[in-house]
Amino acid sequence: MASGMGTRFGGNKLMAELDGVPLIQHVIRATDGLFARCVVVTRHDEVAELCHALGVEVILHNEQYRNDTVRLGMEDMDGCATVTFVQADQPLISAKSIASLLSSAEEDSESIWRVSFEGTPGAPVLFPAWTFDELRALPLGKGGGYVAKAHKERVRTVEVVGKWELVDVDTVEDLQVLRHHVSREFEGLSS
């Protein structure tokens, strides 16, 4: 999901760089090879161009609300057993955590699966086919979390390795905090 307007960030945050790479590209790398199909839903031409260059399918739109983004992403998902919503502004999400989410869903395919850190749920979120009609008919302004909350008893979680995986970038300050974290991690590796 790459359709945020970036109002708090002051622009298109998904093309802002972390460690010399656009935020969305970090997320695309983390999903590489894990899904039968990867579709990025965005309202940003620059994001669409990058996705095309990386060989990722894109739905470019000018809709206003989160439910529109979900509906557009769900349009061609008939025949899929699950869909996974991955936020494009979580550049430190790891392939390992996403793979754990997918393998957990293979063991229990009727549950909604989401990642968490120390019991606090976050994204990505994996939805089984029985939720698809609800996802396509979300109330105005609502996202997949609305469906997960409506079926709390069917939500399961998979722990991520570290809290930084679930940090999303909403403001320039958020990005600065992540840059500081990444530089400190790099310093720790090189010493």
Mark where each language-model region is.
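Conserved N-terminal catalytic core of the sugar/cofactor nucleotidyltransferase
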Residues: 25-84
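Conserved alpha/beta core of the MobA/IspD/sugar-nucleotide pyrophosphorylase nucleotidyltransferase superfamily
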Residues: 137-191
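N-terminal glycine-rich phosphate-binding loop and ensuing alpha1 helix
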Residues: 1-43
